[in-house]
Structures are given as structure tokens and as C-alpha cells.
From Swiss-Prot:
Family of the protein in this entry: Belongs to the ubiquitin-activating E1 family. UBA5 subfamily.
Function as written in the Swiss-Prot or TrEMBL entry: E1-like enzyme which activates ufm1.
Name of encoding gene: uba5
Transmembrane regions listed in the UniProt entry: none
A molecular function GO annotation: ATP binding
Annotated active site: C219 (glycyl thioester intermediate)
Positions annotated to bind Zn(2+): C195, C198, C272, C277
Chain residues that bind ATP: G52, D73, K96, N119, N153
Assigned keywords, A-Z: ATP-binding, Metal-binding, Nucleotide-binding, Ubl conjugation pathway, Zinc
InterPro entries assigned: ThiF/MoeB/HesA (IPR045886), ThiF_NAD_FAD-bd (IPR000594), Ubiquitin-activating_enz (IPR035985)
GO BP: protein ufmylation
Stated name of the protein: Ubiquitin-like modifier-activating enzyme 5
GO CC terms in record: cytoplasm; cytosol
Length: 381
């Protein structure tokens, strides 16, 4: 275990001094963004998978001062992992959980760490994993506050989904595409939003064993930039969810080719194959029936973000004034390269091309449509 570079700090302080690692985090309170940032010390999070997303997410939460992190992985650090963030070459051969805990505890000794070096998909390990969700909180015997899924296969995602459904625990799923140019995060609240099995991926719907698709010498692409962006999206959503500020995204994607961030809300499937999901759906319907004034989580968060924007405009000790919101910016800067809807099926819109001779030219700009192009072609000689 690495020796910490400083003594533990019992209580977060907003005092602006060089030796205070929390002063810039606590400034969020002064800016009117977060009302209770110090509450992060009372929260616990499970991270399953310490790959390109999970390891970076663990570091971010550690630097943010989370109360407790429970780390799950059964893999070892390899030189092939060095194209990503976090792990170092000298840690090669160590279990990812051990290497991660060594690094993270040296970054912030205030955080409690618990590491488990096993595969959660086996029967015995699954029961232990579920037990840590239920009783592995900051105070032993209490549940953790959130589970983050940062795994790269369907089997592990299904195990996390099953454990959280059985316990009624919310979790966030994340992933990056095999070509490394897109990714997503998804908040899964049992009964309120789609669980992982509500809309199964094609590989499962087709009845294919994903293990048969792995070929020797062939691997998925990996970019540290995409991994870092998705990890940032995941932790940002985690902070908003746990500290109750801003708008918590239900489903947020990222397309690196267009720098496009689509959003959507995934409703639960009433014909989901998971019986626990159906039970939670029925409970949530009953809850809404008995509480007609209750809105879905998206509406609640929309109200929160509007209130926070108004508050942060003027109410801070530095007198900083907000002159433009992201909504204003989007309205004033139309980008026709981006689709007008929030479809996650969109990947790349190929620009129209026209073959011309040396004397002929056709001007094509971002606002050109098919009719304009046809008129220009007809006028050519």
C-alpha cells in the first residue's frame, strides 16, 4: 500500500489555502451550483470494471472526495492497457483492483477503499457482490448509494442488472463502441426506466454466444480520449444524481466523429423478460397512481437546473454574471451537421458530392438542400 502524502482531513473546508485539496470543490457551493457538496463524504459507490472507463471514473470520484469506493474486477494490468489512462507500466502483472487501490489511496487518503478481485458472474461471487451492494455502504450494514457498471461484456452487465433489480437499487451503465469513436451512459432506476434487459442488444436477441465472436489476434479499438470523455460523462451524472443538482441524464450518448451528444429517455418494456423488472414497473405505476403530483425524474431535474441557473447568475460572492446558457448558445449557433432529432441510430451523415469538369463549379454550403443543388446543376453549361 502506498504511503499517503498527507494526513487525513476529517472535515471538508472551503478555506482557500494551498494545502486544502477541497477548496476548489467547495467553491461550487459559493457559486450556487451545489448546496451540500460536503455530503459527498457520506456517500459510497461501487465500480464494477476497472478498464478504460472504470479506472478513470474511480480516480475522478477519489479526487472529488467520495466517502467510500468499492472496486470489482478480476483482470490484471497489462502493457497493452497503457494506451489508456490511469495505470502505469510498473504496475503490469498486478491485479487491477490492487493497483487501483494503491494509486487512489495515495491520491486521497480520506477515501475508504474496498477491493474485490473476482468475476461477479459466477454463482458464489454474484451472491457476495449482491451482498456488498446491500450492506457495503460507508457504515457497514447499510446499502451503497449507487452502482456504476463499467464492464465490456453482456454477461457482466446482466449480472449487475440482475443484482440491482433484486435489491431495487439504481445503477448507471456505461460503454464505448468497438471502434472507439462513440460511447454512452445510462441511468437505470428499477421500474421507472428501462433495465438492461428491456431492450437487449442484437447479439443477444440473435441468440449468439458472444464468446464465439472473439478471435485470436483481433481486438476492439481503444482511444484514451473517448474513454476519458465517457468516464467524465459518467462521473458528472453520478455527482448530479447523488448531490441532487442539475439535470440527471437518463441516456446520454457521444459520437466522436461529429462531437454530438444525443439524449433520450428509455421507458421500461412492459414485456421485459426479467420478472423483477415487471414487479418494479407495477410498483412504480402504483406509486404514480397514489402520488399524481409526482413527476418523472427528468421533469424534476429540469426544474432543478432552471433554478440553479437563475441562482448562479447573481448570487455568488464574486459577482460573476451568467450571460449565456447552453440553450441560448444552441439556439444561436445552428449546426446542420447534427441531426435534428435525438436518435441514437445516427452515426454519420455523408455530405453530397458532385463530379465536375475543370470549368464547372457548384457551390455547396451547410444550408444547401437537394432542390438548390439541382437548380445549380441545371444552370451549368
Amino acid at each position: 500500500m502506498a504511503t499517503p502524502y498527507r494526513e487525513k482531513i476529517e472535515k471538508m473546508s472551503s478555506e482557500v489555502i494551498d494545502s486544502n485539496p477541497y477548496s476548489r470543490l467547495m467553491a461550487l457551493k459559493k457559486m450556487g451550483i451545489v448546496n451540500n457538496y460536503e455530503n459527498i463524504r457520506n456517500l459510497s459507490v461501487i465500480i464494477v470494471g476497472l478498464g478504460g472507463i472504470g479506472s478513470v471514473a474511480a480516480e475522478m470520484l477519489t479526487r472529488c472526495g467520495i466517502g467510500k469506493l468499492l472496486l470489482f474486477d478480476y483482470d490484471t494490468v497489462e502493457i497493452a492497457n497503457m494506451n489508456r489512462l490511469f495505470f502505469r507500466p510498473e504496475q503490469s502483472g498486478k491485479s487491477k483492483t490492487m493497483a487501483a487501490q494503491e494509486t487512489l489511496s495515495s491520491i486521497n487518503p480520506d477515501v475508504q477503499f474496498e477491493s474485490h478481485n473476482y468475476n461477479i458472474t459466477t454463482i458464489d461471487n454474484f451472491e457476495h457482490f449482491k451482498g456488498r451492494i446491500e450492506k457495503g455502504g460507508l457504515v457497514e450494514g447499510e446499502p451503497v448509494d449507487l452502482v456504476l457498471g463499467c464492464v465490456d461484456n453482456f454477461e457482466a452487465r446482466t449480472a449487475i442488472n440482475q443484482a440491482c433489480l433484486e435489491l431495487g437499487k439504481s445503477w448507471m451503465e456505461s460503454g464505448v463502441s468497438e471502434n472507439a469513436i462513440s460511447g454512452h451512459i445510462q441511468l437505470i432506476i428499477p421500474g421507472e426506466s428501462a433495465c438492461f434487459q428491456c431492450v437487449p442488444p442484437l447479439i443477444v436477441a440473435s441468440g449468439i454466444d458472444e464468446r464465439t465472436l472473439k478471435r485470436e489476434g483481433v481486438c476492439a479499438a481503444s482511444l484514451p480520449t473517448t474513454m476519458g470523455i465517457v468516464a467524465g460523462m459518467l462521473v458528472q451524472n453520478t455527482l448530479k444524481y447523488l448531490l441532487k443538482f442539475g439535470e440527471v441524464s437518463s441516456l446520454l450518448g457521444y459520437n466522436a466523429l461529429l462531437d454530438y451528444f444525443p439524449k433520450d429517455n428509455m421507458k421500461p418494456n412492459p414485456e421485459c423478460s426479467n420478472s423483477f423488472c415487471i414487479i418494479h414497473q407495477q410498483k412504480y405505476k402504483e406509486f404514480l397512481k397514489n402520488n399524481p403530483k409526482e413527476n418523472l425524474i427528468q421533469n424534476n431535474n429540469n426544474n432543478n437546473i432552471n433554478n440553479n441557473e437563475k441562482k448562479s447568475t447573481y448570487e455568488n460572492e464574486w459577482g460573476i454574471e451568467l450571460i449565456e446558457t447552453s440553450e441560448d448558445f444552441n439556439n444561436n449557433n445552428n449546426n446542420n451537421n447534427k441531426p435534428s432529432n435525438n436518435s441514437f441510430e445516427f452515426s454519420y451523415d455523408k455530405k453530397p458530392t458532385v463530379e465536375l469538369n475543370e470549368q464547372s463549379t457548384v457551390k455547396v454550403n451547410s444550408s444547401s438542400n437537394l432542390e438548390d443543388l439541382m437548380n445549380q446543376l441545371k444552370n451549368m453549361k
